[in-house]
Amino acid sequence: MISLRSFRPCDWQVITQYQYTNLSQANAVNLIGEFNAPTYQGKFHKLLAIANDTQVVGYVSMIETVEGTVSIGVEVYAPFRRQGFAYAAISQLLTIANACGYHTVSAQVRKDNTPSLALCKKLGFAVVDEAISRRGNPVYNLVKPI
């Protein structure tokens, strides 16, 4: 059963195994505190663990971009990809975003990320334009009304 939940201090091992491999336990626990903050740079923000029963398999995030719109992201850790976790997690995140009063969701996906593009289309996102990301990668900007 897939669920979304806040990261817990005991999740430090998961995030240092799959994502922040150079962090100490203390720094990972501090980072989890930042994950759970309600705002980031003064904007509404949620970063939630994707849990498959008790195992954390990745995370989803949303941050307010403009009034009524949040940008979302998902990361499923490599050993758990291609098992439907991202679809289930984003579906739940869309419900949370709507309950928080947002009516539009945006996402940015690298043009060469075929699985993520297919996922966004399956979830009803539409490409609105193309851009170059802050990291210099060609991306699609997608939106979905909720």
List each model region and its residues:
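Conserved catalytic-core motifs of GNAT/GCN5-like acyltransferases
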Residues: 108-109, 124-141
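A short beta-loop-alpha structural element at the N-terminal edge
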Residues: 1-15
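A short beta-turn/loop motif at secondary-structure boundaries
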Residues: 64-66, 112, 133-135
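Alpha-helical elements of Rossmann-like donor-binding domains used by nucleotide-donor carbohydrate transfer enzymes
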Residues: 14-17, 34, 88, 92, ...
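Acetyl-CoA-dependent GNAT
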Residues: 6-10, 20-73, 77-79, 145-146
